[in-house]
């Protein structure tokens, strides 16, 4: 359900509708799991501050994703400035009725996160929004601020890099220890 653009929605409605997507996008854009809550809050502080200025020229979802991408980019710049290394969290103990399945899922997610972290910001943003979040390319280009052909070019390059990294990860995973 997309919120109507002729009336200004309140922040609670925006958060309810877009919060889970923002959370996932932040994670895929390189925000450490331990920092996602804070960065997500930053996104919605900006949404709250700028919501009265939302003109509806794009969908609310596209507008929120644009804020999300800029906030994640700022986060990565601050992390570099503080000389932090954005790494995966230490492995957690698995407690489930299917520990092997849960562990495999967690490893796959960690592999994807490592692959995405290796992409430059421009390619990662396009790949995440198009391939993972399912936005159309016109919306992706509006969010990241590039021409349509550039968006397709970045997507093509990102797909090639992701495929190459995934094949390498599979080959490393199948080697005997």
PLM regions: where:
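Short, Lys/Arg-enriched C-terminal cap helix and immediately downstream tail that follows
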Residues: 56, 77, 119, 159-177
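Arg/Lys-rich amphipathic alpha helix in sigma70-family domain 2
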Residues: 53-55, 66-87, 105, 168-170
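Σ70-family region 2.3-2.4 aromatic/basic alpha-helix that recognizes the −10 promoter
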Residues: 19, 44-48, 58-78, 155, ...
């Amino acid at each position: 359900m997309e919120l109507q653009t002729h009336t200004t929605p309140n922040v609670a409605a925006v958060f309810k509708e877009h919060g889970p997507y923002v959370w996932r996008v932040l994670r895929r854009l390189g925000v450490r799991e331990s920092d996602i809550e804070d960065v997500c809050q930053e996104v919605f502080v900006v949404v709250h501050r700028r919501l009265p200025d939302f003109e509806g020229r794009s969908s609310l979802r596209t507008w929120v994703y644009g804020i999300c991408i800029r906030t994640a980019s700022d986060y990565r710049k601050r992390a570099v400035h503080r000389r932090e290394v954005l790494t995966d969290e230490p492995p957690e103990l698995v407690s489930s009725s299917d520990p092997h399945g849960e562990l495999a899922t967690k490893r796959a997610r960690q592999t994807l996160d490592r692959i995405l972290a290796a992409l430059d910001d421009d390619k990662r943003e396009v790949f995440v929004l198009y391939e993972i979040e399912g936005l159309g390319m016109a919306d992706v280009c509006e969010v990241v601020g590039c021409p349509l052909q550039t968006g397709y070019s970045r997507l093509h390059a990102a797909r090639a890099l992701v495929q190459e990294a995934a094949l390498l990860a599979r080959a490393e995973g199948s080697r005997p220890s």
